[in-house]
């Protein structure tokens, strides 16, 4: 969760925790 948050904003990655970014949420 925290890991994805760090990449939030980059293409192909998302922040499942914050819910701000959502492109390809695998987890």
Curated annotation (Swiss-Prot):
GO cellular component, one term: extracellular region
A GO molecular function held by the record: toxin activity
Principal subcellular localisation of the protein: secreted
Disulfide bond residue pairs: 1-17, 8-21, 16-25
Tissues in which the UniProt entry reports expression: Expressed by the venom duct.
Keyword terms of this UniProt record: Disulfide bond, Ion channel impairing toxin, Knottin, Neurotoxin, Secreted, Toxin, Voltage-gated sodium channel impairing toxin
Subcellular location as annotated: Secreted
Family, as annotated: Belongs to the conotoxin O1 superfamily.
Domain notes: The cysteine framework is VI/VII (C-C-CC-C-C). The presence of a 'disulfide through disulfide knot' structurally defines this protein as a knottin.
Function of the molecule: Delta-conotoxins bind to site 6 of voltage-gated sodium channels (Nav) and inhibit the inactivation process. This toxin inhibits tetrodotoxin(TTX)-sensitive sodium channels. A test on mouse Nav1.6/SCN8A confirms this sensitivity.
Name of the protein in its database record: Delta-conotoxin TsVIA
Lineage per the UniProt record: Eukaryota, Metazoa, Spiralia, Lophotrochozoa, Mollusca
């Amino acid at each position: 969760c925290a890991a994805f948050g760090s990449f939030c904003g980059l293409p192909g990655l998302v922040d499942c925790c914050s819910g701000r970014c959502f492109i390809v949420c695998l987890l």
